[in-house]
Regions:
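A short, exposed loop/beta-hairpin motif centered on an aromatic-Gly-Thr core
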Residues: 35-55
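Short, mixed-charge low-complexity intrinsically disordered segments
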Residues: 62-97
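Hydrophobic helical h-region of N-terminal Sec-dependent signal peptides
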Residues: 6-10
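A short beta-strand micro-motif
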Residues: 21-32
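Positively charged n-region of N-terminal signal peptides that target proteins for export
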Residues: 1-4
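C-terminal motif of bacterial Sec signal peptides marking the signal peptidase cleavage site
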Residues: 12-15
Length: 97
C-alpha cells in the first residue's frame, strides 16, 4: 500500500512540474511581422515540447493560408515570460522554428 501511494505521489508531482514550457507564436502574414512589443498578441498556446509547439503552429499557418491565401510564419519560444526590466516585453530563453 505504501508503495502504491509513493508511486501515485511521484506521478502527481511529475505531472505538476512538467509544465507548458513552449509558447507558439503565429504571424498570419509573413510580409507584416509584428514588432516585439506586439508579439504577445500572436500566441496561440503553450505546449510541453518543442515538437508539439511546432506542429500546432504549422497547423495554424496551414489553416490560415487555406482561408486567407496569405503565407504566415511562426516561432516557438522556450520559457517565455514578461520582463519588467524590458518594458514588459515577452522574453523567451530560446526561440526555434
Amino acid at each position: 500500500m505504501k508503495i502504491l501511494l509513493a508511486i501515485i505521489g511521484i506521478l502527481l508531482l511529475s505531472s505538476c512540474s512538467s509544465g507548458s514550457d513552449w509558447t507558439a507564436f503565429v504571424y498570419p502574414d509573413i510580409e507584416n511581422i509584428p514588432s516585439a512589443d506586439q508579439a504577445h498578441n500572436y500566441t496561440i498556446g503553450n505546449y510541453s515540447t518543442f515538437e508539439e509547439c511546432q506542429a500546432a503552429a504549422i497547423e495554424r499557418i496551414r489553416n490560415n493560408y487555406a482561408t486567407t491565401g496569405r503565407q504566415g510564419d511562426y516561432q516557438c519560444g522556450y520559457k517565455c515570460s514578461r520582463r519588467d526590466d524590458f518594458g514588459g516585453l515577452l522574453i523567451c530563453k530560446e526561440t526555434r522554428k
